[in-house]
Curated annotation (Swiss-Prot):
DNA-binding segment(s): 79-173
Originating organism: Xenopus laevis (African clawed frog)
Keywords for the protein's UniProt record, in alphabetical order: Developmental protein, DNA-binding, Nucleus, Transcription, Transcription regulation
Keyword Transcription regulation among UniProt keywords: yes
Protein name: Forkhead box protein C1-A
GO cellular component: nucleus
Subunit structure: Monomer.
């Protein structure tokens, strides 16, 4: 609303005339307008449409805005379109040595741009701020030849191309000084890290390979089959391989003897063992006795029990009396060589150096089974020469042999026998001679014959060299396969 007041009128300077009590602000304004003619053009828009527009516009505007001539502002007072970085760069480049002090920068800017001649405190602070924050400006200390206040400022050699095409109006990018030392340290750190990681990876790979090799070795050791020969028994001797026949696995094992009983036997070739042995294993342990078969008899039991007082206490009274009088009855079954390996597992170890090939001595429990299976009329023998009956089977022959021929040649297997084993030997250990004539008698008649045989042995004079052997030809099988005999447990 500067058009209200005419420039030529003294009232246009904003001087309000004195207002008395009767005069109001609006009257004074109207008087000032009448004096200067400021409000004469207000009626022009009302009469604008009744007259030609061009003439009415010229008449109204000539009176309203004609006398107003605004004071023109000089071009030097306009702020230049350059940034403070560009102004500082101009000042440094215009210097003769390409370096200038802070005061020289101020003087250059004020001489070139009159806009910065006023308000010096504001823009000079901005100049100092840009000098310290931008890396493109480098501070050079003043030398002694040119004493003065302040240091020189110059441009970094890499910052001359930071403006596009030499124009200070536009900058390409913010300049960042390259720190060579920092780059070198970064490269060294990266190289060291790579080497460290490489060494760690090599060590880890080597450790993994060692672990894999150890695991594979453990698997190989676990997968190897354990040989039976490598298993040590209670007395430190290697155990023999067992027979794989399922029918022979039910035979009870013979317990290993004590060290005292084994030492008291006096036999240098006695081998203590707590497992059953086959003929092949016995031959491998005794290579100098390979022509002879194994033997187990009551003689071996008696010799082992003589060295063990505890075992002699467990014997029944008939066996104790016979051992005191020097009787060594041996019930031995002699087999042919063709059938020796079949019945090898139920019998225990004992080598014979003087007996012929094919003799095999079985334990007393097997004899009790044979007696129940092949029951018949038993003839008691009160004399050393056994008497035969007319109904005797032709395949079974009974012969009395001298215990002296076996006592010097056999290597007894010493072992303390349990009570269930000795109870069987109590009934069968005193048979001096017996025949098995027929197989038509039942078990009760066989038991009566055994009782009469035992009573006859106790009452008859004792011959210390008598023993009983039964020889089986190879044509006769030990176990009957015809099924004629039925084993009934209710009879017992």
């Amino acid at each position: 609303m500067q058009a209200r007041y005419s420039v030529s009128s003294p009232n246009s300077l904003g001087v309000v005339p004195y207002l008395s009590g009767e005069q109001s602000y609006y009257r004074a304004a109207a008087a000032a307008a009448a004096a200067g003619g400021g409000y004469t053009g207000m009626a022009a828009p009302m009469s604008m449409y009744s007259h030609p527009a061009h003439e009415q516009y010229q008449a109204g505007m000539a009176r309203a805005y004609g006398p107003y001539t605004p004071q023109p502002q000089p071009k030097d007072m306009v702020k230049p379109p350059y940034s403070y970085i560009a102004l500082i760069t101009m000042a440094i480049q215009n210097a003769p040595d390409k370096k200038i002090t802070l005061n020289g920068i101020y003087q250059f800017i004020m001489e070139r741009f009159p806009f910065y001649r006023d308000n010096k405190q504001g823009w000079q602070n901005s100049i100092r701020h840009n000098l310290s924050l931008n890396e493109c400006f480098v501070k050079v200390p003043r030398d002694d030849k040119k004493p003065g206040k302040g240091s020189y400022w110059t441009l970094d050699p890499d910052s001359y191309n930071m403006f596009e095409n030499g124009s200070f109006l536009r900058r390409r990018r913010r300049f960042k000084k390259k720190d060579v030392s920092k780059d070198a340290t970064k490269e060294d750190k990266e190289r060291l890290l790579k080497e460290h990681h490489g060494s760690q990876s090599a060590a880890a790979q080597q450790q993994r390979q060692q672990q894999q090799s150890q695991a594979q070795a453990e698997q190989d050791s676990n997968s190897q089959p354990v040989r039976i020969q490598d298993i040590k028994t209670e007395n430190g001797t290697s155990s023999p391989p067992q027979s794989m026949s399922p029918a022979l696995s039910a035979v009870p094992k013979i317990e290993s003897p004590d060290s005292s009983s084994s030492m008291s036997s006096g036999s240098p070739h006695s081998i203590p063992s707590n497992r059953s042995m086959s003929l092949e294993a016995a031959e491998s342990h005794h290579p100098h006795h390979q022509q002879h078969s194994q033997g187990f008899s009551v003689d071996n039991i008696m010799t082992s029990l003589r060295g063990s007082p505890q075992g002699s206490a467990e014997l029944p009274s008939p066996l104790i009396s016979s051992s005191r009088t020097g009787i060594a009855p041996s019930l031995s079954l002699s087999y042919s060589p063709g059938q020796g390996s079949i019945y090898s597992s139920p019998c225990s170890q004992g080598t014979s150096s003087g007996g012929g090939a094919g003799t095999y001595h079985c334990n007393m429990q097997a004899m009790s089974l044979y007696s129940g299976d092949r029951s018949g009329h038993l003839t008691p023998a009160n004399t050393p020469a056994a008497t035969t009956v007319e109904e005797t089977l032709p395949d079974y022959s009974i012969s009395t042999t001298s215990a002296q021929s076996h006592g010097n040649q056999e290597h007894p297997h010493q072992g303390r026998l349990p009570s269930w084993y000795l109870n069987q030997t109590g009934e069968l250990g005193h048979l001096a001679g017996a025949t098995y004539p027929g197989q038509q008698q039942n078990f009760h008649s066989v038991r009566e014959m055994f009782e009469s045989q035992r009573l006859a042995l106790n009452s008859s004079p004792v011959n210390g060299n008598s023993s009983c052997q039964m020889s089986f030809p190879p044509s006769q099988s030990l176990y009957r396969t015809s099924g004629a005999f039925v084993y009934d447990c209710s009879k017992f």
